[in-house]
A protein has these predicted regions:
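PLP-dependent amino-acid enzyme catalytic core
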Residues: 1-158
Length: 158
């Protein structure tokens, strides 16, 4: 069954964040043949950052705004090894926040360049150190949070 959503797709959105979460639900048929029940999947790759992490980043930032811990002129700080960093950088950029990300040296050059292109300041930290080492991306993010006035440390891993 093909559903024509051209009218909805052509609707002007206030910004890219309004597209987060509006991902299609697809009925699975062939892959689940022989199983009882109905099976569906969400195409999270249809989010602007091509990941379900867009939902998470938007939710975290909006909750911080509601609680009053994040407002104009503030900086979002996080450790990341993947899509969460991109999503936080994107949401921060659109909402006007600064974004600082601490990443492992295992991160690809392309990923680091993409984070920079999204407006994030990226600190590349050695990957061959323990999590409690002051040079680890966990500790670097904590230190930056203590040094950067008006910052919020997301702390997704703990």
């Amino acid at each position: 069954m093909i559903i024509n959503k051209t009218k909805d797709l052509m609707k002007v959105q206030p910004n890219i964040l309004s597209l987060i979460g509006n991902t299609p639900l697809i009925r699975l048929e062939k892959v689940v043949a022989g199983f009882d029940g109905s099976f569906f999947t969400k195409l999270e790759s249809f989010n602007p950052g091509h990941s379900n992490k867009d939902r998470i980043a938007l939710h975290i930032i909006e909750e911080a705004e509601k609680k009053g811990v994040l407002s104009d002129g503030y900086t979002v700080i996080e450790t990341t090894s993947g899509n969460t960093g991109f999503s936080l950088a994107m949401v921060s950029l659109v909402k006007g926040y600064n974004c600082i990300l601490a990443v492992s040296s295992k991160s690809s050059k392309d990923k680091i360049e993409m984070l920079n292109a999204m407006g994030a300041k990226v600190y590349v930290c050695p990957s061959d150190v323990s999590a409690d080492d002051p040079r680890s991306y966990y500790q670097v993010a904590k230190k930056l949070h203590s040094e950067v006035e008006n910052s919020v440390y997301i702390n997704q891993y703990f």
